[in-house]
């Protein structure tokens, strides 16, 4: 049974012209205008792609740093030992550890946003797969979070890095910033994300690749973008 929409949502939805494709500037202005959350909500972009995620070469996954940040202070943990652990601390990681950090997470601590690991720690970190995997927190080479360059990884995470991956239906959701951002900042972040997704087109995809793009705030209705204008 479909969840009943709130009165505030329905009022906001009335301001979105049905069937209209908005340019990016119009879309972000409207999303900001119709947001009704009593906090600084996140604005997210959703892509629907013409990909078959059953094919390994058509699964998108990666990371990028948004030019205007995310508006969120990221709590970063690093699994590392010795000199690499010190490097992570110097780079600004919030929590650094090895077996002790693995044990802490096994005991239920998950108060962080990004997890980074050096390759030599992945045997231990792998034991956390069932905990970190479903939350999208498992370190992965494709997102730059399994690396010996922990300084860059921590700096990127603290500077507004976002990750992206296709779900089984070919959708990709990426946060672009907060409602408090200017339209220009949101549009700049969106264009950066759009370029990355467009360039990640698998060679085996035929026909139209990006089928649908929309933006919305946390609780607000979505606004569809005109991809021909991008």
UniProtKB/Swiss-Prot annotation:
One of its GO terms (biological process) is translation. Signal peptide: none annotated. Keywords: Repressor, Ribonucleoprotein, Ribosomal protein, RNA-binding, rRNA-binding, Translation regulation, tRNA-binding. Pfam families: Ribosomal_L1. GO terms for cellular component: large ribosomal subunit. Gene3D superfamilies: 3.30.190.20, 3.40.50.790. One of its GO terms (molecular function) is structural constituent of ribosome. CDD domains: Ribosomal_L1. Part of the 50S ribosomal subunit. Binds directly to 23S rRNA. The L1 stalk is quite mobile in the ribosome, and is involved in E site tRNA release. Protein L1 is also a translational repressor protein, it controls the translation of the L11 operon by binding to its mRNA. HAMAP family: Ribosomal_uL1_B. Belongs to the universal ribosomal protein uL1 family. This is Large ribosomal subunit protein uL1.
């Amino acid at each position: 049974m479909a969840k009943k929409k709130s009165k505030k949502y329905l009022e906001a939805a009335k301001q979105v012209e049905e069937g209209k494709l908005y340019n990016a500037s119009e879309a972000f202005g409207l999303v900001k205008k119709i947001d009704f959350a009593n906090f600084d909500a996140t604005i997210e972009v959703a892509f629907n792609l013409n990909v078959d995620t059953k094919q390994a070469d058509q699964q998108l996954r990666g990371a990028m740093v948004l030019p205007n940040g995310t508006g969120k202070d990221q709590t970063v943990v690093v699994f590392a030992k010795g000199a690499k652990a010190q490097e992570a601390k110097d780079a600004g990681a919030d929590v650094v550890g090895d077996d002790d950090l693995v044990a802490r997470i096994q005991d239920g601590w998950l108060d962080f946003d990004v997890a980074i690991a050096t390759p030599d720690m992945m045997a231990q970190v792998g034991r956390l797969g069932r905990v970190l995997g479903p939350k999208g927190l498992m370190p992965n080479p494709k997102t730059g979070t399994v690396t010996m360059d922990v300084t860059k990884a921590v700096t990127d995470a603290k500077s507004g890095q976002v990750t992206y991956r296709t779900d089984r239906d070919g959708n990709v959701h990426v946060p672009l910033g907060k409602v408090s951002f200017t339209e220009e900042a949101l549009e700049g972040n969106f264009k950066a994300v759009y370029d990355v997704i467009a360039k990640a087109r698998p060679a085996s995809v035929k026909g139209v690749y990006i089928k649908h793009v929309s933006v919305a705030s946390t609780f607000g209705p979505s606004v569809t973008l005109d991809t021909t204008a991008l």
